């Protein structure tokens, strides 16, 4: 007899501007995994499925089932600063979770909505989109604190063998206890991208913050190496050159395209503003002619 698994969350709705920030963050480096936290709200929706039978002049319910659908709405993300760069794993410190909770409270006051930390995301450069055993165990740990907590993975720098073009895959998951085992296994959660015409202020601030965070990570790594006393002068010069090279690469791959995108967006907004002003003038002329 098959055992039906009860999911804590039935679906995830990810705002397109938050999706854009996640994607830019995942594509910022192909050597190590990156990560961040998702800010949003968890809504409960009631779904009623009823079956009726008709006997003579009365209609009565044979079976009525009330299901509570839990949907996670992700409105923005917080890009986390990595204290330890690893190729195959990422970790969230308690200090980062606390700072994210404080930011969620600030957003809740601004929007008047019950914002909180509802999940986390990280990248899988050059590897499959499916979570590893470490990812599943980490997700299970977060769910012990919050059953509605979800995990997102962005697999990037993957090349299609047939078309020879790059592609990005993403998935959302939670962890469940495996049958007759102490281990955990993943369960996939349907994820839907909610389209937006404009990018929100909070997501725009996160996108602008990305180059700063990447620069801070490089500075921290360089300072740790530079503080070692046993290094000779040639090694220190080499480390300085590597540091400069990494910063230039970030400017070329992240800061430059981001600046160009912001300038293009500004030009589009100015053009749209001119069109609206022209439309306003035409409407005012029509209104004055009617008077």
UniProtKB/Swiss-Prot annotation:
Gene3D superfamilies to which the protein is assigned, alphabetical: Cytidine Deaminase, domain 2 (3.40.140.10)
Positions of post-translational N-acetylalanine modification: 2
SUPFAM superfamilies to which the protein is assigned, alphabetical: JAB1/MPN domain
Cofactor note: Binds 1 zinc ion per subunit.
Motif (JAMM motif): 122-135
UniProt GO MF annotations: cysteine-type deubiquitinase activity; enzyme regulator activity; metal ion binding; metal-dependent deubiquitinase activity; metallopeptidase activity; polyubiquitin modification-dependent protein binding
Localization terms from the record: Nucleus; Cytoplasm; Cytoplasm, Cytoskeleton, Spindle pole
Main location (coarse class): nucleus
Top-level taxon in the UniProt lineage: Eukaryota
Pfam families on file: BRCC36_C (PF18110), JAB (PF01398)
Every MPN domain range: 12-179
Repeat found in the keyword field: no
Co-factor requirement: Zn(2+)
Sequence positions bearing Phosphoserine: 233
One Gene Ontology term from the biological process aspect of the record: response to X-ray
Entry's EC annotation: 3.4.19.-
Keywords: Acetylation, Cell cycle, Cell division, Chromatin regulator, Cytoplasm, Cytoskeleton, DNA damage, DNA repair, Hydrolase, Metal-binding, Metalloprotease, Mitosis, Nucleus, Phosphoprotein, Protease, Ubl conjugation pathway, Zinc
GO-annotated cellular components: BRCA1-A complex; BRISC complex; cytoplasm; nuclear ubiquitin ligase complex; nucleus; spindle pole; ubiquitin ligase complex
Keyword Hydrolase: yes
UniProt binding sites for Zn(2+): 122, 124, 135
PANTHER family, A to Z: EUKARYOTIC TRANSLATION INITIATION FACTOR 3 -RELATED (PTHR10410)
Family under the similarity heading: Belongs to the peptidase M67A family. BRCC36 subfamily.
Subunit comment: Component of the ARISC complex, at least composed of UIMC1/RAP80, ABRAXAS1, BRCC3/BRCC36, BABAM2 and BABAM1/NBA1. Component of the BRCA1-A complex, at least composed of BRCA1, BARD1, UIMC1/RAP80, ABRAXAS1, BRCC3/BRCC36, BABAM2 and BABAM1/NBA1. In the BRCA1-A complex, interacts directly with ABRAXAS1 and BABAM2. Component of the BRISC complex, at least composed of ABRAXAS2, BRCC3/BRCC36, BABAM2 and BABAM1/NBA1. Identified in a complex with SHMT2 and the other subunits of the BRISC complex. In the BRISC complex, interacts directly with ABRAXAS2. Identified in a complex with ABRAXAS2 and NUMA1.
Function: Metalloprotease that specifically cleaves 'Lys-63'-linked polyubiquitin chains. Does not have activity toward 'Lys-48'-linked polyubiquitin chains. Component of the BRCA1-A complex, a complex that specifically recognizes 'Lys-63'-linked ubiquitinated histones H2A and H2AX at DNA lesions sites, leading to target the BRCA1-BARD1 heterodimer to sites of DNA damage at double-strand breaks (DSBs). In the BRCA1-A complex, it specifically removes 'Lys-63'-linked ubiquitin on histones H2A and H2AX, antagonizing the RNF8-dependent ubiquitination at double-strand breaks (DSBs).
Entry protein name: Lys-63-specific deubiquitinase BRCC36
Biological source species: Mus musculus (Mouse)
The gene coding this protein: Brcc3
């Amino acid at each position: 007899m098959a055992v039906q698994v009860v999911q804590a969350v039935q679906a995830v709705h990810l705002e397109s501007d938050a999706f854009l920030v996640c994607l830019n963050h995942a594509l910022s480096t192909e050597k190590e995994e990156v990560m961040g936290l998702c800010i949003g709200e968890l809504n409960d929706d009631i779904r009623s499925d009823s079956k009726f039978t008709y006997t003579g002049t009365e209609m009565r319910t044979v079976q009525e089932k009330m299901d509570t659908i839990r949907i996670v709405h992700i409105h923005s993300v917080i890009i986390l600063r990595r204290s330890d760069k690893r190729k195959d794993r990422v970790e969230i410190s308690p200090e980062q979770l606390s700072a994210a909770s404080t930011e969620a409270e600030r957003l809740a006051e601004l929007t008047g909505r019950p914002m909180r930390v509802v999940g986390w995301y990280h990248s899988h450069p050059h590897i499959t989109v499916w979570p590893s055993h470490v990812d599943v165990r980490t997700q299970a740990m977060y769910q012990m604190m919050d059953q509605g907590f979800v995990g997102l993975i962005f697999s990037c720098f993957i090349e299609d063998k047939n078309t020879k073009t790059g592609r990005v895959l993403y998935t959302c998951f939670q962890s469940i206890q495996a049958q007759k085992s102490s281990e955990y296994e993943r369960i996939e959660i349907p994820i839907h991208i909610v389209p937006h015409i404009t990018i929100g202020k909070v997501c725009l601030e996160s996108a602008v913050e990305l180059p700063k965070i990447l620069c801070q990570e490089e500075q921290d790594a360089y300072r740790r190496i530079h503080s070692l006393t046993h290094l000779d002068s040639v090694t220190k010069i080499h480390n300085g050159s590597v540091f400069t090279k990494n910063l230039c690469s970030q400017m070329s791959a992240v800061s430059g395209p981001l600046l160009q995108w912001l300038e293009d967006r500004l030009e589009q907004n100015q053009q749209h503003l001119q069109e609206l002003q022209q439309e306003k003038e035409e409407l005012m002329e029509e209104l004055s002619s009617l008077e």
